[in-house]
């Protein structure tokens, strides 16, 4: 079976991209365990706790990331450079994601056959 990477690179609530990516990820996890999840650029904001999407009339889907354990999604990485650029190095995120420097992250991403970006 092909290995599938889900890359979240956009901030939450400005568009439906993050929510759609999360829905696709959870649906795909029912079919395969060969999944990897990557958070890069503004996608690191997807994992911030305490968001208030109702203030912008958006649906609160961020809590759904906490279901990764239930869906056996354990290959999760976050770009260390993106965290530094946004001052988020010492934040407790809603999921456990391993920080990787950009070179290591690209190397890990290269291990996947299909890359879906949201």
Curated annotation (Swiss-Prot):
Disulfide bonds: none annotated. Pfam families: DsrE (PF02635). GO terms for biological process: tRNA processing. SUPFAM superfamilies: DsrEFH-like. The keyword Transit peptide does not apply. Its main location: cytoplasm. GO terms for cellular component: cytoplasm. It is found in: Cytoplasm. Keywords: Cytoplasm, tRNA processing. PANTHER family: PROTEIN TUSC. Part of a sulfur-relay system required for 2-thiolation of 5-methylaminomethyl-2-thiouridine (mnm(5)s(2)U) at tRNA wobble positions. Belongs to the DsrF/TusC family. This is Protein TusC. The gene is tusC.
